[in-house]
Amino acid sequence: MTMQPSYPEGSTDRPAQSWTEVWLRAVTRPTVATYQDIATRPGVSSRRAYIWMFAGSFIAYAITLIGVLLFGGSSILGQQEAARIASDLGTTIVVLICIAPLGGVFAILGLMITAGISQAIARALGGTGTFTQLAYIIAAYLAPIGILTSLLAMVPFVSCLNLPVGIYSLFLNILAVKSVNRFSWGKAILSSVVILAGILLVVAFVVIVVLALLGPAIGNVFSNIIQEMGTPAP
């Protein structure tokens, strides 16, 4: 077995790692030392993190559609949706080409928002990391795990494993915040889970209130559109 050479932290002699090396280490060797090493190696950039999230989301969506074609009503999309998509391969390809890139864009936005809020809170609590480092680490584990969950969702009897995978992802998020910002577990949990969850709850509450206020108006608009679509042209 070949031993990898060790380099002092921050050394410029450490080589940049390929995406496969980074993903594998981030998912299978989650320690503070590992994450700090990944975050301080050459090649760390927000651009690379965004590419990973886009590619991971695209692949995950493609796997989901393939699952619909292979397993039909047993897939996560349900029997009616599965029958509709599986009945037309051409439609499936068009959906993949048109919608999957949009999912990749939303994945990037989600990474930017999550890493941005978590890092802002971490800095306020005395963290020393950067947004780029945190986004890079999060993308390094989130992209492959997203692909994994899509694979698990293809098989009904295995899809139940998505729950422990989700819990594991939450742990990796806390570990990423702690490793990048070099502070305690308590501050890491506060930065990555508690305050972020509070913000999301506030946003959800605001959305619910807005929808409740605008619900009747939105319903009337859709009702008029449906009526116009059902009315034959003169």
Report the location of each language-model feature.
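Helix-boundary and loop/linker segments of multi-pass membrane transporters
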Residues: 37-43, 84-93, 181-182
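Short, solvent-exposed mixed-charge patches
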Residues: 232-234
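Hydrophobic alpha-helical transmembrane segments in multi-pass membrane proteins
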Residues: 49-74, 92-117, 136-173, 190-214
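Membrane-interface segments at transmembrane-helix boundaries
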Residues: 23-27, 114-141, 173-189
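Membrane-interface interhelical connector segments
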Residues: 74-92, 125
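N-terminal juxtamembrane cytosolic/stromal segments of multi-pass membrane proteins
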Residues: 1-59
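Selective transmembrane helix interface/packing segments
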Residues: 2-6, 102-129
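Amphipathic alpha-helical segments typified by the pilin-like N-terminal helix
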Residues: 210-230
